[in-house]
Structures are given as structure tokens and as C-alpha cells.
């Protein structure tokens, strides 16, 4: 397919767009409602087409042999609409407010055998189209396919040449729009000879009806005329599963672990006379040995610059994820489009770069780091470089296949400008504040110059086992909800239960913190003081489980296929797992650090 011209440049709207997003979290045009008078023209924009089971594989509507104006005029698009693959253009449909149309001819066409074959292929791949009326998306299938698996075998393909538009209004505003092909017979595309032309007449009708619903948000969410699945119901199974796991883990940490610690502290804090009389310097081998390593537990780890960068970027994504969910709870995103979420995510990522710079530089200076500039460069590159490499591959595949998901050059330059003028400077500014406000690392115990030898560890205290346990338990807390999230991002579901999403997100962080504390305690009890990186890897491995789940979802829970969709799915699924590794690794590390400070502060040292 040939790529059509890109929509008019919207660079002049960039800074107003950012300001609107900053103040309201909304995209211009997504929630705006136009007021009409009877007889006013209502513009219908054609947008995109693509396989129903491949949501990210979309093409311009006019890349199909359909009714098309002589000169294609594109609608100016917002950032989120461009990122969502929208390429809206004016159409030949003539619709006027509150004026019904019984049956009007749109155009007459003579299709060659090659054009008919193009339509047949699109219909066999279940192509759907998307139009936009007053910022309301309306969708339908391009054609009809009937296939029987019994003898005699039949394979019939037909094209919908008549569309029935149904629009609901309240006063002077359009509340709902839908398209259907009920009581319409498809035009057969079978039996055409290679040198033969097919004559088609495209028609349409328009029906207006008044509704008592005053606002679009009051209309039943997810009601898309049955084209896409309805909004998901409350996921009680996910909530119960997560709550049970949280109660078990919190109970384990708060009751069992604290009871063990109380016994340890009571034994270790014997006064010197009792300890010396009972040979207190020789600990029983059955006792936990975390007290023995008090002179090594705060020994700074290797690759401290990389560790601080992980913590900084992880803290940034924790803030970004929380911000997105809070904005969704406040009703700042339209249920019909994901474009507003894309725009908000880009804006929040740029603004929260100061968090990554501050956290990374602050902790780096605390643990004695001296290469501050290198730490900032590593922090700002830790996510942006993998993201850029992944996006380059995905965008190249889209571009090679003529997909509208391929970003225009102007959009790429603008996004790069935002990162260079907003994201990177804020990282540096945050790093400066973090470095200047950092105080020396406050360790409850002094660290000896010579490191203590670590005794051999049993297999169940290995890094691999800790990563398996620490990754699987947080993953199991969100596994049910994760299906619905995948079905929304990579499928046709419409997710609006943001309250439950916030609840599950909080559960995920809580489970990660509890697991981290428990695993760190067991590691220290084995006289292994190398907890710094272990705490990050143990719970951060949840990202690996999420990626493995994405492989399972692709193979067993979806009907996605083709190079375009497959490359995008696995590319961004890998990035998603990486982001969860950064977030949960950060939560895990600071939870373990807080726990270790607590137990050693309460331990009386000689």
C-alpha cells in the first residue's frame, strides 16, 4: 500500500497543547462538543482501516479503493491522535444536523480486478474502518465473509456498499453516533474475471433521533453499537486474589518476621556480663547470623552508578504511573480514544525527569560516588536509549508497510525537541539539587576495611530462587487484572475501571515491599551481606514474569498475526517488562534499606 500525504503540520499548536495538557490533562478536540443549528453541516472524517485482530496495524482509509474526493484534505491532529495512528481526512458524505437522509448516492465506481482483489484480501483479514463525527469515532466492517467447512464448501465475500448512520442529539449537541449495515445485502466480489471491471454504487442514509441524555459521558460507556466489546465488569476474582495475597504477606512480615526479630534482638542485646559468662562471642550455629555481619551490611556495592540510575528512573516511573492513574480517576481521559493517555504520558515523562535526576544523584553522592556527570548521563539514558532503539525498529516496520502508526518526521522532531529542551534539562536540574542536598550515608554500623568472607549458601538462598519467588508473588497479585489491561492495549476491550486499577497498583507495590523485606532478612540471616543488588533483582524480576505472560497472551489469548503487529507487540511488551523491573526494583530496594536500618539501629553494638 502507498502512504498518503501526512496531515498538516501542527507544530504551531505544540506549546498550547502542552499547556492544555498540563492544566487539564485533556486533548484539544477530544472532549470538545460543537453546537449546531438545524440544517448546519456536520463534517464526517474518514480515518483509518486495519485488521480487527491487529489493533496497531492501521492504514489510511483512502488506501482502499473507495469513494474519495479529488483533493484529499486532512484534519489538523493533536499529538495524541498522531501517536494513535489517526489520519483524519474529509469525506464525500454530506450530513446536516437533524436532517434525515433516506438513501443518497455517494459515488459510482468501476473497479479493476486488482482493486477487487485488494478489497477481497482486506475483507478476508476482517478489516474494519473508523470514521469520526464531531470527535465521536464510529466503526464498522468493510465487508462480509461467509465460509462453510462442510461439503459442499463455500467461500463468499461481499462488500458493504450502503451504510446507515444513526446519530443521537440533545438540543444543539450530538451525543452519540453509530453506523450499521442492518437490512443491507452485501455486494458480491466473487466470480470476477481478470480482465473484467466491477461496477459499484455506494450509498448511505442518515437517521437522527433525540435523546434525553445531556452529556456524552452519561451515555453508557463502551456502547459502540456492539462493534467493540462492552466495558468490563468489576473483576471480583482479581480483587479477592490480590487481597488474600496481601493479607498473607503482610501478616507474615508483621507477625512471624517481627516475632523472630524480637527474639533475635532480645538475644543479641544481652548485657556484657551475661554475654561474656555465656561465651557471647560464639553464636550458636542455629541462630540467625544477621548480627555477625553488622560491619559489612552497609558496605557499598559494585556498579553504584548503575544502581543509582536504576533507582532514579524507577522512582520516575512510579510517579508517572501514579500520575496517569490519578488523572484517569479524575475523568481526564475519553473512553473512546487512547490519544489523550499517550499525550499525558509523554508530558508526564518529560516533567518527571527531574525526579530521576534528583533521586539518582542524591543517593549517588550519599554512597560516595564522585563521577556525577557520568551518573546523570547514565540516568537519562537508562530508559531513553532502549526505548529509542525499540521504537526505531517498530517505526521502521510500520513505515515499510505503509501503516499510519509510522510517525511523520515533524512529530519525531518535536518529540526529540521536547526531550532535549524539557526532559534532559530537568534531569540535570534535579541532579544538581540532589547532589547539593545530599548528606553522607547514615549507617547505624561502621564498616570494616576488610570484607568478611561469606559462607557457602544453600541453593534456596541463591539469586535465581529469590528472583523466582520475588517475581512470581507480585505477578500473581496482578495476573487476573493484567489480562484485562492487555485486552485493552492489545485488543478491543475498553477499560474504565480506574479505581480498581489504582487499587491493584497499590497492592502490587505493597506485595513487592513485603516480599523484599522477607527475602532480605533470609539473605542476611545466612551471613550474606550482598543485599544491594539482590533486593533490586529479586522483586524487579516481576518484569520478566510480565514479559513471559505477554508471550503466553500472544500465543493463547489473542488472534494477532503478521509482521507489523508482532514486532510492535513484542517490542513494547519487552519495554513494559523493563519498566516494571525499574519500578518494583526501586520499591524493593528502598523497602529493604528501611528494614535493614531498623534492625541495626535497634541492635546494641559493642
UniProtKB/Swiss-Prot annotation:
Using the UniProt record, give the first listed, main subcellular location: membrane
> What biological-process GO terms show up in the record?
autophagy; protein localization to membrane
What cellular-component terms does GO give this entry? autophagosome membrane; cytoplasmic vesicle; lysosomal membrane; membrane
Question: Which named protein is this?
Answer: Transmembrane 9 superfamily member 1
Protein's job: Plays an essential role in autophagy.
Q: Which family does it belong to?
A: Belongs to the nonaspanin (TM9SF) (TC 9.A.2) family.
Regions that span the bilayer: 237-257, 310-330, 339-359, 373-393, 412-432, 469-489, 499-519, 535-555, 570-590
| Positions annotated with a glycan in the UniProt record | 178, 401, 559
Q: Which positions make up the signal peptide?
A: 1-27
* One Pfam family linked to the record: EMP70
